[in-house]
Amino acid sequence: MVKQLKFSEDARQAMLRGVDQLANAVKVTIGPKGRNVVLDKEFTAPLITNDGVTIAKEIELEDPYENMGAKLVQEVANKTNEIAGDGTTTATVLAQAMIQEGLKNVTSGANPVGLRQGIDKAVKVAVEALHENSQKVENKNEIAQVGAISAADEEIGRYISEAMEKVGNDGVITIEESNGLNTELEVVEGMQFDRGYQSPYMVTDSDKMVAELERPYILVTDKKISSFQDILPLLEQVVQSNRPILIVADEVEGDALTNIVLNRMRGTFTAVAVKAPGFGDRRKAMLEDLAILTGAQVITDDLGLDLKDASIDMLGTASKVEVTKDNTTVVDGDGDENSIDARVSQLKSQIEETESDFDREKLQERLAKLAGGVAVIKVGAASETELKERKLRIEDALNSTRAAVEEGIVAGGGTALVNVYQKVSEIEAEGDIETGVNIVLKALTAPVRQIAENAGLEGSVIVERLKNAEPGVGFNAATDEWVNMLEAGIVDPTKVTRSALQHAASVAAMFLTTEAVVASIPEKNNDQPNMGGMPGMM
């Protein structure tokens, strides 16, 4: 494909037009009085949203140079969303401010490399100051405040707070669409996996079609069990203890399944067989998780273990197991706490190292099941459009809350960034490096300025007063009042604010040091003239 090129000022100005188009569409949503953006959807109703990253992803510009500029800012939003889960609009506003101010200086003859050094220096000091001003999130009310501010809805904040209280900070909280009007919270305690009983004759409650096992033994193996004789010695030991058993295996079939069902119907013993969850290597890992949670040993050829040699002390135990047609839930496994903690740490390390979103999601699910359970927030709304918008807000609020628990909170509404202004202004530098520091200084006030303008106020007036206010005191755009932001519950997660600043600075620095842009020339549609119809035939 043939390429076209632009150089120096022409290249940067073309990309700046793209940056401005995307940023101007996104920044109208920031703050409590931010507006919505309507996104056209080809086969469904238009989506109305104020979620920065969702808007950014939809923008595709016709001009290839402008589109590259837009994609750079889109990358800021995506990266911030990936790391912190929220703060995408703040990151976009910061990136636009740094790029605009930086480009003015480059046009005036400043050295882009010097500007980059100044930007990096200023951001490092700003991030350190943010961490110094950060406060830990320690109770349920503070968690609810973070969620409520992010979603602009107190009820959502309360649901997230309750969910985190019940399943722990590492627990999985999923967001699903409800068929009703109301939003509800549902909690599944313990480890649940999507495999049910292998025969309906295994149920203990025929009305509910559920098998409920109290204080059961749990056999965990990756083998197929076809012969009843293979597990008979083990089952005899279980029968003597007068306790039920859950068999988790690759598959229970043939003679083994028939005899388990017959003995269950005769009342000889209570046994429920389920297929092992997952596939391939993931199945092995999930079986190990279950074994660690319940104190079992996985019966596998990898360890040189055979079912015939299995004894009762190789089985795990739990306070309760519930098996339905589709799911198995293990509650309060009796595994060793130290082993569980070690497994949790291992999974956290794998989550940090993996580059695959799919793998990360599956690892987080496994972590949650070990750490305490799964909570489901079922989102209700009056229309499909409202449902989608509400679901996006809850996802952002959940991510914000997790970030707050991880790194603490700072004053919200852009106040935290202005609070570090003084520290950054004390950096000693000269020449283009000093100019780079000044670019960041101006950008630090951009979110507050935009929040004020979205509320119909003069941004510059609010910024100047905020610079002279006590640390933590900020402008509440929802009520047009000056308040202590932390006391008023107007807070932002430190991780979100920090990530937004770092990613915005990174892209701005790359933008300013760009000297040439290479783009593909769009192919023209050379429509062929219509062929005349065939002449009539005799």
Swiss-Prot record:
A GO term for molecular function: unfolded protein binding
InterPro entries given in the database record: Chaperonin_Cpn60_CS, Cpn60/GroEL, Cpn60/GroEL/TCP-1, GroEL-like_apical_dom_sf, GROEL-like_equatorial_sf, TCP-1-like_intermed_sf
Localization, UniProt: Cytoplasm
A Gene Ontology biological process term: protein refolding
Quaternary structure, from the entry: Forms a cylinder of 14 subunits composed of two heptameric rings stacked back-to-back. Interacts with the co-chaperonin GroES.
Function: Together with its co-chaperonin GroES, plays an essential role in assisting protein folding. The GroEL-GroES system forms a nano-cage that allows encapsulation of the non-native substrate proteins and provides a physical environment optimized to promote and accelerate protein folding.
Annotated family: Belongs to the chaperonin (HSP60) family.
Protein name stated in the entry: Chaperonin GroEL
